[in-house]
Amino acid sequence: MKQAVIVDCIRTPMGRSKAGVFRNVRAETLSAELMKALMVRNPQLDPNDIEDVIWGCVQQTLEQGFNIARNASLLAGIPKTAGAVTVNRLCGSSMDALHQAARAIMTGQGDTFIIGGVEHMGHVPMNHGVDFHPGLANRVAKASGMMGLTAEMLGKMHGITREQQDAFAVRSHQRAHAATIEGRFAKEIWGIEGHDANGALIKVMTDEVIRPETTLESLAGLRPAFDPVNGTVTAGTSSALSDGASAMLVMEESKARALGLTIRARIRSMAVAGCDAAIMGYGPVPATKKALARAGLSVADLDLIELNEAFAAQSLPCVKDLGLQDVVDEKINLNGGAIALGHPLGCSGARISTTLINLMEEKDATLGLATMCIGLGQGIATVFERV
């Protein structure tokens, strides 16, 4: 079976969804700029060899509708001969795009793919046009479609306190801020034109949503956002609302080597799994276990882990049940996570994978895991191995 490898991986800065730097920039533009960047950064690649562009996006309507993958690839100048498809596995969409490309490569259905994802949550809100079938109430609780309440449920089941959540959120902002000022995020960010608060055109090079001023004291003053009476989950311990895109160049290993391209990581294994929709945030646990089993590995074999921070109340139970409580500061989300950077739904899977690969290079790590929960009860996971 052929081997799928990551040749390059980049992301946009994360813009604040409410009146942020990308308020006048469309989702197709964020996507196209990254597609163009991958071709610029890898001049050995003949764009005519691109088999398919596979792009994750959740709210596929308005500017994100009518197959945004194709719209963006045409904007980027990718040859018309390349295909393009938009995929939707909710929060796991761009990681699913990676899995689709990897499976195609492994089975000989192409050797060069651009994958990624986007979500402009400022232009197309997360709940825009959502209309659940009434019959779902016979199968799952109505609250299962309310992500904050599922986090409350999962946190309560695992005894996660408000104080633990606040501490986890502070850590996310502190580490993301440190990664910014120390230049570590600069390795993965591709600058995008946006507008400052006065409307002036600027080149955005850093994430807008990180709040370095966040403290335990400031978070303690926030009210519960989803269950006002008995809740513990606040806006401060939830992933920020942000706009962004991420992208990867995925190739068959021998093809990449023949072109003299640097191979940054191999895809060692992949998995998706389902769980109860009422605790959708638990999905990374079964997905991770399945991916590790397929790779013949254990949790202890992993050097670094990126666990998407949908909510602190969701992340901490996953850490607990994967047996990672004692290695959080050595292995997990070393540059912060979605609580600080935001979770543009269709973007995040490739975003956390990009951050992971850069951290693996920085730490000279061999094995890494990227995993995330998915609304309505799923998880997705990818094990990467540095060559």
From Swiss-Prot:
> Which EC class heads this enzyme's classification?
transferase
Q: Where are the transmembrane segments?
A: none
For whether the record's keyword set contains Nuclease, the answer is no
Active-site annotation: C91, H343, C373
Main localization, broad class:
cytoplasm
Pathway in which the depicted protein is active: Lipid metabolism; fatty acid beta-oxidation
The record's listing under InterPro entries reads: FadA (IPR012805), Thiolase (IPR002155), Thiolase-like (IPR016039), Thiolase-like_sf_Thiolase (IPR050215), Thiolase_acyl_enz_int_AS (IPR020615), Thiolase_AS (IPR020610), Thiolase_C (IPR020617), Thiolase_CS (IPR020613)
Reaction(s) catalysed by this chain's protein? an acyl-CoA + acetyl-CoA = a 3-oxoacyl-CoA + CoA
GO BP annotations listed: fatty acid beta-oxidation; phenylacetate catabolic process
Annotated signal sequence range: none
| Family named by the database record | Belongs to the thiolase-like superfamily. Thiolase family.
Q: How does it assemble?
A: Heterotetramer of two alpha chains (FadB) and two beta chains (FadA).
PANTHER family reported in the protein's UniProt record? 3-KETOACYL-COA THIOLASE FADA (PTHR43853:SF11), 3-KETOACYL-COA THIOLASE, PEROXISOMAL (PTHR43853)
Q: What does this protein do?
A: Catalyzes the final step of fatty acid oxidation in which acetyl-CoA is released and the CoA ester of a fatty acid two carbons shorter is formed.
Name of this protein: 3-ketoacyl-CoA thiolase
Gene name tied to this protein:
fadA
